[in-house]
Amino acid sequence: MRVAVIPARGGSKRIPRKNIRPFAGKPIIAWPIKAALSSGLFDKVIVSTDDAEIAEVAREAGALVPFIRPKNLSDDFADTKSVVRHAISELKLETEPEVQVCCIYPTSVFVDAQLLKEGLEKLNESKCSFVFSVTSVDPSVYRAFTKAADDRITMLFPENYAKRTQDLPSLYCDAAQFYWATVGAWQSDLRIFGPKSIGVFIDPSRVQDIDNEPQWLAAERKFQEISQSK
């Protein structure tokens, strides 16, 4: 059995009502719901929310909303694992450690069926506990600086002063799109970003933080470019 859990709280601060704001003709949450449904991977596509309007929009997009998330798991400090664990409990899956659960973020407009399938394949073929989306970091933090109170600048890694950028190690960060694991891993003390995790590498052109208006507009431009290229 496989379940997709899309966590979508109603209290977005920087972009109010972000999770159901129109994006390319649909409420933004409808895009990851569509990707999950079209992948054919999941027995259930669940939206975990504390918000009645989000629940209604999610159902209209084809997702299930079998429970309402409590307020204590819907504030700025609620972490992903706690939200997924709550969903696992509500779905009565605590005693089924091999069930596979994919957490997909509600603004993951660039997630598609192929990326979700690649993540599942890596989870099945490896001995890892978590598989999640990653993207490259550019420019490299190995050439980064710190700033003192008097505005003096110091290299964070001065040993790299004379090195060319192309000679520095490649760096990656969380693309904040999806996270695959079994129920057993979600319920464990293992960290999502730990030594038993594997990445699905996504081109930066398909990654965009959406935490403010300029980022929202940038995501819309990227989305339009990708849609027109298909």
Where in this protein do the model-derived segments appear?
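Short phosphate-binding loop-to-helix
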Residues: 53-101, 111, 118
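Short, structured coil segments at secondary-structure junctions
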Residues: 41, 61-63, 149
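Conserved core of the sugar-phosphate nucleotidyltransferase
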Residues: 100, 109-196
